[in-house]
Each structure stands twice: as C-alpha cells, then as structure tokens.
C-alpha cells in the first residue's frame, strides 16, 4: 500500500510530505523542500558471491568506471556508498573517488548482507556481527579514503530498531532514498532514465548502482539522459550532505520482506520496488 501511495503521489505531483524530526525518522529518505535539487547516490555492492565471480573470471569487473566518467563529464555531484569488500578490491579507485570534490563517500556495510531478515534473498548478518560490518568498512574508509561522511545505507534498505541503534551508536546517519532507480539487471538505459526522471521530486534521493557488470549493466548509459532531462526541468544535482541541511521529509516505507520474482523482467515492477535482493549470493 505504501508503494502505491508513493506512486500516486509522484504521478499527481503532490506537495512535499510534512517534515518530521530526526528522532521520528528511521532514515533520511528525502528533504522537504520546494527547491529543485536532487541527490544522485550510487551503491558499490560487493557480496562474497560477487567476489568469487570476479576472482573466477565470470565477471570482468565490479567497478563501472563509465558511471563516474558520465558524472565527471557533466559536473554532476553524487554520493557514493561503498561496501568494505569493494574498497578492499578497488583501493586505488577508492582513493581517487575520495579525492574528487564532486563526490562524497559513505558506508554500505562490509559484505552487503541483510541487517534485518527476511530481506529479499540477501544472506542474513547475525546481530552479533552487525557492528563489525559497520566498523570494518569505517576502518577501510579511514585507511583508503581519509575523507568520508558518516552516512550509512542498509543493504536492501532493510533494517529494524536494533540495527538502527547499532549503526547510530557508531555515529552514523542512516540514508535511504525515495527513488529506486531500478537499474538492477535492467538492460535498457532509456527505461532506467525515463523511470528516474518521471519520479524525481524536489529533494529526492535517487538510488542507483556503480558496480556494473551483469547486475547493473545500463546505469552508465542512462546517466546522460537523466542528467540532461532533469537539468532541462530546472533541477540541480547536490550531495546528500547538502540535503541534510534541510528539513527531512516523511520517511519512505521500504518493504523488508522476501520476494522471489527473479524470473520476472525488472521493468514490470513500479519505480519504488527495490531489486537489491538479486545481489545476495
């Protein structure tokens, strides 16, 4: 029901949702503003299964540099959420991204497991190991990035009260998103671009992916259209840190339930349905 209401709100051009306090919101999903600003965010997922595919030669790379090139060429700011396994695999890239003022880096756990289950088919992270998932990646960000934001995005956007406390106790602000870019496994850049552009509203946080490969093959080629069309509509691109200076909009209700639709084409689902469950192996 929440997803349906979100879709209707986007279609009808409803006004931004009422603001809520930091204490009331489980995540920062978007800013309550009438200003045409939007934050593009990109997750660099890496599960143990993805790492095995890389080492076994099944996948050439889990770093889609064309995503970064598209952003740089168009001077579009972005916030990048990196998993610890991804940082360990691409330490030089992490350093380069951290040094680029166009970007800011955040924490996306160490191994991209579920902090709350069921969460699609992501493998569960036991409660006793969740703090280490956050801290290990924090240590890696310190080592390879130096400069980073204390922002955390839950894998699959799945969490519960205990997981939230674990993350917040380590000094992190939890970041979600109100627009699922639906680029996971989608092969059509035009479809990804059209989906994002049609749902963006002032203060939106768009969730996309930067690991490429078979899991997110269309993202880089969708970005030129996304950036060009949103700028034509008067939008400018900001980082999550810019949105956090504004009041928070009402949180988006992200379903934390298992769904087995791997046999369905990605583009049959609404824009607000997340596909991160495909990444768990």
Regions found by a protein language model. Give the residues of each.
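N-terminal pre-catalytic segment of deacetylase/amide-hydrolase enzymes
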Residues: 1-62, 94-95, 225-229, 233-281
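Active-site beta->alpha N-cap acidic-glycine motif
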Residues: 20-106, 111-117, 138-143, 148
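Extracytoplasmic/secreted proteins, especially bacterial periplasmic and envelope-associated proteins
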Residues: 37, 62-66, 89-92, 129-132, ...
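A cross-domain feature marking catalytic cores of carbohydrate-active enzymes
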Residues: 42-44, 82-84, 107-109, 154-156, ...
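Acidic-and-aromatic substrate-binding clefts and catalytic sites of carbohydrate-active enzymes
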Residues: 48, 58-59, 82-91, 153-160, ...
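CE4/NodB-like, metal-dependent polysaccharide N-deacetylase domain
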Residues: 68-82, 104, 122-158, 165, ...
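Accessory recognition modules or surfaces
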Residues: 101, 187-189, 196-210, 215-218, ...
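His/Asp/Glu-enriched short active-site or ligand-binding loop at hydrolase and phosphoryl-transfer sites
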Residues: 148, 163-200, 235-246
